[in-house]
Amino acid sequence: TGCSISGKDKKESTTKSLAASEKAVEKEGMDKEEAYVKASEYMRNMTLEEKVGQLFVVNLEQLDSSKGSYFEWKKCSKKMAETVKKYSIGGVIMFSRNIGVRKQTKSLIKKLQNNAPVPLFVTVDEEGGDVARIAGNPDMKTTSFPSMEEVGSKQNTEYVKNMGETIGNDIKKLGFNVD
């Protein structure tokens, strides 16, 4: 089941491992033309199935529905690992129900990434106030911020910049790469 193509359009996957992909982004200051060339080359080496899979960001229950459509997955199950690998999904979104403590969250993200043929976007909704999947959990030991309404009322761009940097740094340490 799933996406399938046949005939001359089908080719074997030649996507690089996570380690190889990380090396490609280590270089900073890449100009737009060089980035375009590298991205085009990478895309040329992807199968159609991998390209389609990259369009999807899913929750953990969509990777493993064996416990129902709303389960508090906190570990990477064998089925999740297989699904990430098989469909080359673009990313996962995690919710409060998936986030317990720092070590558990890092481990879950690492195992998902280790099974992904293309590095995943790992997302979490972390705005401040009531929208704080990480900071709202005292076991995560991250910085809490007020709601966006309160932040906006301050009209302090330096505060907003520092807030964004702090949230970004806090979630990056856990393995998230999209807020």
Residue ranges of each PLM-predicted region?
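Enzymes and membrane/adaptor proteins characterized by extended Gly/Ser/Thr/Asp/Glu-rich
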Residues: 61-76, 81-179
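N-terminal, intrinsically disordered, polar/charged segments of Gram-positive cell-envelope systems
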Residues: 6-45
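C-terminal motif of bacterial Sec signal peptides marking the signal peptidase cleavage site
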Residues: 1-2
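Mature N-terminal segment immediately following signal peptide/propeptide cleavage
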Residues: 31-65, 85
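Generic detector of short, locally flexible boundary/turn motifs and exposed helical patches
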Residues: 18-25, 58-60, 85-90
